[in-house]
Curated annotation (Swiss-Prot):
Pyruvate binds at T45, I204. One of its GO terms (cellular component) is cytosol. It comes from Agrobacterium fabrum (strain C58 / ATCC 33970) (Agrobacterium tumefaciens (strain C58)). Is allosterically regulated by the feedback inhibitor (S)-lysine. This is 4-hydroxy-tetrahydrodipicolinate synthase. CDD domains: DHDPS. It comes from the Bacteria.
């Protein structure tokens, strides 16, 4: 259903801090032209925590409008408030999204039973396929493979996971708990090669914002079983995977885009639009290593 390279899209801002709809639409068009296999608006990389509800909904709508069914749109619809998650999910469904990305509730640290109840409530409120977003480093809660399996058995529209645990053995554990048809997408660019080798089928990628064609070709090689070719792409992309996260958040990604495509580097507070000189130098070197900048 969903596979390959699926960028977790940035949300561009203007100099005055508002959402730059023209730049976002152009970014979506470029992603599709470069071979991306799907799109995820308003996830972590889209700075969803600092978007208003109206902005969140508008970015989802715009992504769907521009994509025009050429590639699937998996709309970010997560919250640590169950009612709010349902509201965002219903809006994405009405707007025409193809699926939902629903993050595990962050900060309030629900139990496994609480996670089951939260995702069950969202699944029962919508008809769209749901991809669970499990990211313990940010949400401070880790959905177990057993809870995931119970959700899959209880709700036919819970169909996959974006796994950002960094634990490659989870792919096998989740396949056992959730079944062979459960869609497993890596949430970490650097470990996507190993993730697919364990049975994953793609990556919801940050680096694909900057290198969509390379990331798409990397995933295509793996899905074709050509791991020797995939390893060449891995070596070409790995410095970039690392460099854009030398400082937290999406600042590094937006800096890289400013160098390759002239994008606005602005992020919303409390993130910082400026980077340390050493970070900029590392990103520049990584872009050159990947063949994306002279």
């Amino acid at each position: 259903m969903f596979k390959g390279s699926i960028p977790a899209l940035i949300t561009p801002f203007t100099d005055n801090g508002s959402v730059d709809e023209k730049a976002f639409a152009a970014h979506v068009e470029w992603q599709i032209a470069e071979g991306s296999n799907g799109l995820v608006p308003v996830g972590t990389t889209g700075e969803s925590p600092t978007l208003s509800h109206d902005e969140h909904k508008r970015v989802v709508e715009l992504c769907i409008e521009v994509a025009a069914k050429r590639v699937p749109v998996i709309a970010g619809a997560g919250s640590n408030n169950t009612d709010e998650a349902i509201e965002l999910a219903l809006h994405a469904q009405e707007a025409g999204a193809d699926a939902l990305l629903v993050v595990t509730p962050y900060y309030n640290k629900p139990t496994q039973k609480g996670l089951f109840a939260h995702f069950s409530a969202v699944a029962e409120a919508v008809k769209l396929p749901i991809v669970i977003y499990n990211i313990p480093p940010r949400s401070v809660v880790d959905m177990s493979p057993e809870t995931m399996g119970a959700l899959v058995k209880a709700h036919k529209n819970i169909i996959g996971v974006k796994d950002a645990t960094g634990k490659l053995d989870r792919v096998s554990e989740q396949r056992i708990s959730c079944g062979k048809d459960f869609v497993q997408l890596s949430g970490e660019d650097g470990t996507a090669l190993g993730f697919n080798a364990h049975g994953g089928v793609g990556c919801i990628s940050v680096t694909a914002n900057v290198a969509p064609r390379l990331c798409s070709e990397f995933q295509a090689a793996m899905l074709a079983g050509d791991y020797a070719k995939a390893l060449e792409y891995q070596d070409r992309l790995m410095p970039l995977h690392r460099a854009i996260f030398m400082e937290p958040g999406v600042c590094g990604t937006k800096y890289a885009l400013s160098k390759t495509r002239g994008g606005n580097r602005r992020v919303r507070s409390p993130l910082m639009s400026t980077l340390e000189p050493a970070t900029e130098a590392a990103i520049d070197a990584a872009l050159k290593h990947a063949g994306l900048m002279n």
